[in-house]
């Protein structure tokens, strides 16, 4: 299913609306779209000691039409909430109780994670990045890794059944 494709202007308009609603302007903060972001869908970047906002960064996979408008708005609002809470409190609040209270005030979940299904493009990129598949010889439990140590099979055992492990190199 394909949803609305977002661009920087759409994001800035939504951030401007949030700023007007909560009386904290963020129109001067740059917005960037990153193709490299795979673990997080959004990020609020600020200078460590002064808390001066640097930029909002959003994953290209979030904005490519794979996620519903509600999900995209929730991620953008979450990052705005980081900006709002840090600015009001005058210190980085990460995901503390003040941040969670502001999330509820803004009508979004206060989780540090999301339960969104990974888009097909993002899932494909993540799967491509794995170079090794590790399989337990006893129970068949499988994990994937990007890097492993030379003596991996000698030093480690299966976490479920303590069986020996076999490393399979994935073809690219």
Q: What role is predicted for each listed range?
A:
Residues 74-86:
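Active-site recognition of the HExxH zinc-binding catalytic motif
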Residues 2-70, 87-172:
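Metalloprotease/metallohydrolase-associated module, dominated by Zn2+-dependent proteases
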């Amino acid at each position: 299913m394909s949803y609305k494709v977002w661009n920087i202007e759409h994001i800035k308009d939504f951030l401007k609306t949030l700023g007007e609603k909560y009386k904290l302007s963020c129109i001067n903060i740059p917005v960037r779209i990153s193709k490299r972001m795979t673990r997080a869908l959004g990020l609020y970047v600020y200078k460590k000691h002064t808390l001066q906002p640097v930029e909002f960064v959003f994953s290209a996979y979030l904005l490519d039409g794979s996620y519903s408008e509600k999900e995209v708005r929730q991620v953008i609002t979450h990052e705005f909430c980081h900006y709002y809470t840090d600015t009001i409190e005058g210190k980085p609040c990460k995901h503390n109780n003040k941040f969670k209270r502001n999330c509820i005030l803004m009508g979004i979940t206060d989780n540090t994670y999301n339960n969104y299904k990974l888009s097909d493009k993002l899932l494909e990129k993540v799967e491509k990045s794995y170079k090794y598949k590790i399989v337990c010889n006893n129970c068949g439990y499988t994990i994937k890794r990007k890097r492993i140590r030379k003596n991996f099979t000698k030093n480690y055992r299966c976490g479920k059944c303590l069986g020996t492990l076999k490393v399979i190199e994935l073809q690219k």
